[in-house]
Amino acid sequence: MKSGIRVALVTGSNKGIGLAIVRDLCRLFSGEVVLTARDVARGQAAVQQLQAEGLSPRFHQLDIDDLQSIRTLRDFLLKEYGGLDVLVNNAGIAFKVADPTPFHIQAEVTMKTNFFGTRDVCTELLPLIKPQGRVVNISSMMSLRALKSCSPELQQKFRSETITEEELVGLMNKFAEDTKKGVHQKEGWPSSAYGVTKIGVTVLSRIHARKLSEQRKGDKILLNACCPGWVRTDMAGPSATKSPEEGAETPVYLALLPLDAEGPHGQFVMEKRVEQW
């Protein structure tokens, strides 16, 4: 085991914002950086691309939709490093606006990865986070937009300081069920499946931060959700306003908060500023 060596890991990091975050961490983080991807060939190609730039990330396979894949990664981190110092949950999916896939299937598929996949990674890897560790969950300003389009009842639930992870899971499942029945609008949901999944990520971040403050008070771990902005990626398309490098700025800022920092913690951050949830 490489005891004493710090390690940072970014999910879904073979391209786009994830790759830009890995590049910055390779330059700025004092420790090893693990690039992950579902597809081994694509992940290794991304590592080679960074090696050509004089950087040296490690690669490990990770499909956040596959619990066994997450657990294999967990075991690797424990064996190699005895834990994890920085976790950036970047992996996620979105359907294009013009995609003909029925809405309820879009909702189910997007929810499975963006919320449940991210939650599974947190379940397995948060216990590995070392004192003064940093966790960054990539959410989206779409979560704030979707929240404001929810019914007052749903808004109240999602803004609650006491909502539990189980209650949040119940709400995310209800959204998927309501879309299947075609009653999601009647039930107070917005019409963006992606937005609802990112409400889930933001609220999950608030819950996990609260738990860390309660259960690991002295460990000074900081966990936040953030929006990278509208970034030119395969997901957002070519007309977006930011480059991937610009999109990486806020996530990297949160991943590298000084070790003596008191916050932000449990916040939703955009352009390095805390946004009101």
Curated annotation (Swiss-Prot):
Its EC number is 1.1.1.184, 1.1.1.196, 1.1.1.197, 1.1.1.71. Belongs to the short-chain dehydrogenases/reductases (SDR) family. Its main location: cytoplasm. It is found in: Cytoplasm. The gene is CBR1. One of its GO terms (biological process) is lipid metabolic process. One of its GO terms (molecular function) is 15-hydroxyprostaglandin dehydrogenase (NADP+) activity. It comes from the Eukaryota. This is Carbonyl reductase [NADPH] 1. SUPFAM superfamilies: NAD(P)-binding Rossmann-fold domains. Glutathione binds at F95, K96, V97, Q106, A193, Y194. The lineage of its organism: Eukaryota, Metazoa, Chordata, Craniata, Vertebrata. CDD domains: carb_red_PTCR-like_SDR_c. Keywords: Cytoplasm, Lipid metabolism, NADP, Oxidoreductase, Phosphoprotein. It comes from Macaca fascicularis (Crab-eating macaque). The active site is at Y194.
